């Protein structure tokens, strides 16, 4: 059975992605900053895991808890609809820490496991939109080797 770890499953795309893969028979590790029972259908193939992608300690604890995975979906993210000139610097820093640095940190965290295990993650997906492009250097041969 394939195992998929999805960050940012409390709502939106992450929540719907977790639902989809549960319906397809996958083992789903749904991560959230504050896991909430009941947001996803109960299943013996579902694990809710606490994860804040802006915290190195939280990432390390989550990776240690979940073990081997087949797919990582870097979905955790925050949005902002404010005009740049009216947006506090702290809000921009939080957006960058979550959407960019969090994606990089999660990818870095799963690469060692994929190098040790023959069946390590075969696919690592960044969250993408026309306004939130993932730097092309995240698609390295090490990450895309399968």
Named regions from a protein language model:
Residues 10, 18:
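N-terminal Rossmann NAD(P)H-binding glycine-rich loop of SDR-like oxidoreductase domains
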Residues 76-80:
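Conserved NAD(P)H cofactor-binding loop of Rossmann-fold oxidoreductase domains
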Residues 54-67:
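Conserved Rossmann-fold cofactor-binding substructure of NAD(P)-dependent oxidoreductases
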Residues 83-84, 91-94:
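Substrate-binding pocket helix/loop in short-chain dehydrogenase/reductase
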Residues 123-146:
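Catalytic loop of short-chain dehydrogenase/reductase
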Residues 107-108:
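A short, exposed helix-loop element centered on a Lys and neighboring polar residues
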Residues 43-56:
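Rossmann-fold cofactor-recognition segment
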């Amino acid at each position: 059975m394939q195992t998929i770890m999805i960050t940012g499953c409390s709502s939106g795309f992450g929540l719907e992605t977790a639902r989809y893969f549960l319906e397809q028979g996958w083992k789903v590790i749904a991560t959230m900053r504050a896991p909430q029972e009941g947001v996803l259908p109960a299943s013996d193939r579902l694990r809710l895991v606490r994860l804040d992608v802006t915290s190195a300690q939280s990432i390390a604890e989550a990776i240690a808890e979940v073990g081997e995975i087949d797919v990582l979906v870097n979905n955790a993210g925050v949005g902002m609809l404010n005009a740049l000139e009216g947006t506090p610097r702290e809000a921009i820093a939080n957006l960058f820490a979550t959407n960019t640095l969090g994606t990089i940190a999660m990818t870095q965290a799963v690469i060692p496991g994929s190098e040790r295990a023959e069946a390590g993650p075969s696919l690592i997906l960044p969250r993408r939109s026309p306004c939130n492009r993932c730097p092309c250097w995240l698609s390295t041969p090490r990450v895309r080797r399968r």
